[in-house]
Amino acid sequence: MLTRKCAIITNPGAASRNKEVEAMIPVIKQFYNEDCIEYIKAPGTLEGGDVMMVGDHFYVGRSARTNEEGIRQFIAILEKYGLSGSEVKLEKVLHLKTGVNYIENNKMLVSGEFVDKPEFAKYEKYVIPEDEAYAANCIWMNGKVIVPDHFPKVAQIVRDAGYEVILVDTSEYRKIDGGLSCLSLRFTAQK
């Protein structure tokens, strides 16, 4: 997880993902000073798909892959840097960003269990229809929103919210439950 103040190296809940962490550390060190790199340590687990940044606040989904201890460590690290975080309990989805994504300007795309979550009541919510729920996992970048291709309702909802849409084919990633947010790290380098 990359914030504007620090990098937080996760400890994935799926053992098959641990090599990803090992591969990322040398790359992260190219962009963040060593004293601003923090680590989630066992028994804590945390996966990036369970973390959604809204300004300086981070919503963290408790899931099969992100546990209470991982969330506790993550929020403690955030607070060390003057940031904040809060837990969101998940009921049905693999990761938080499977069903909710912040697209800036106080706007969120929500689907399924996130439509009525009290944690998100203060945001302007754009409800994604269940038949296109996969595409709730969109990415805001530089005033535009990247949307999975072949989900015309979601693309129109995003346009109606006032954004230019960039369509990306994610069909191969979808086969392994991957979404757009799984494929990117967006950050401003410290160095």
Placement of each model-derived feature along the sequence:
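The feature marks the mature, well-folded catalytic cores of soluble enzymes
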Residues: M1-K191
